[in-house]
């Protein structure tokens, strides 16, 4: 795992270091859209975050991750649920480094020139999962637009190593869009498909230019549709954030688009800005509205919908999968 210089302030041409991990203002100063800050909204009472506690496994998990040179999206993306998840001994592993080739202004994962892939990472990951005796794991990654296969081969290596050491573990992958490489990536994933295939749409198509520069709404939908055609028995999953400026009607349309493309599982959660340099929160969605989204999801035919302010794509992912009908594997 790399330990690059972390830069948070805007850099001049003279001080710009392409090898540094850029965060916050440094990361977002070069995106093609300008992040306009408005009034900072007060967090409502229903937004509550659980902190890590020394009496739980929080610090044990952090130590194990460092010893095995592993990253988690929980840490890199500043997930508000990290205290609860680490405290219960769960984590979402982030492979292929800690520097993303994209600069999405809602995301706190660092940007920069990625390091070469770590050939030892799949085995280190598999050994860690085996040592922790995890029954369900989520593997995600940074975007790796620099790789000819988008990183799909590395995903497959990780899946294979995990299944060798932990054959009873269910594997969910949260993949990038493999922009321009989707057919190649899906062909590679055919050799060792996951148990759950997740790719997040994140927001309504109207907001893609602002929130997901470099990504395409229809491309993301088609990625999951193509995967489902190849693996009809593997559940597909996607997630949406609310609070970026979308309307309720736009969220409902995204949900319907998901169902029209064969997506089985859904997550919807409240967007929380990682810093004042990121896209601002434009509304806090009331619990009653989340309840409406959940009810509509089941009416549309989703096998499971995890909907609520603090829901994230990987939050209680095992419970989401079980509720959608994904069974635990027998230990061998």
From Swiss-Prot:
Residues 85-303 form the Radical SAM core domain. InterPro entries: Aldolase_TIM (IPR013785), Elp3/MiaA/NifB-like_rSAM (IPR006638), Lipoyl_synth (IPR003698), rSAM (IPR007197). One of its GO terms (molecular function) is lipoate synthase activity. Its EC number is 2.8.1.8. Gene3D superfamilies: Aldolase class I. [4Fe-4S] cluster 2 binds at residues 100, 104, 107. Binds 2 [4Fe-4S] clusters per subunit. One cluster is coordinated with 3 cysteines and an exchangeable S-adenosyl-L-methionine. It comes from the Bacteria. This is Lipoyl synthase. Keywords: 4Fe-4S, Cytoplasm, Iron, Iron-sulfur, Metal-binding, S-adenosyl-L-methionine, Transferase. [4Fe-4S] cluster 1 binds at residues 74, 79, 85, 314. The gene is lipA. Its main location: cytoplasm. One of its GO terms (cellular component) is cytoplasm. It is found in: Cytoplasm. Its cofactor is [4Fe-4S] cluster. Pfam families: Radical_SAM (PF04055). PANTHER family: LIPOYL SYNTHASE, LIPOYL SYNTHASE, MITOCHONDRIAL. Belongs to the radical SAM superfamily. Lipoyl synthase family. Pathway: Protein modification; protein lipoylation via endogenous pathway; protein N(6)-(lipoyl)lysine from octanoyl-[acyl-carrier-protein]: step 2/2. It is an enzyme of class 2 (transferase). It catalyses: [[Fe-S] cluster scaffold protein carrying a second [4Fe-4S](2+) cluster] + N(6)-octanoyl-L-lysyl-[protein] + 2 oxidized [2Fe-2S]-[ferredoxin] + 2 S-adenosyl-L-methionine + 4 H(+) = [[Fe-S] cluster scaffold protein] + N(6)-[(R)-dihydrolipoyl]-L-lysyl-[protein] + 4 Fe(3+) + 2 hydrogen sulfide + 2 5'-deoxyadenosine + 2 L-methionine + 2 reduced [2Fe-2S]-[ferredoxin].
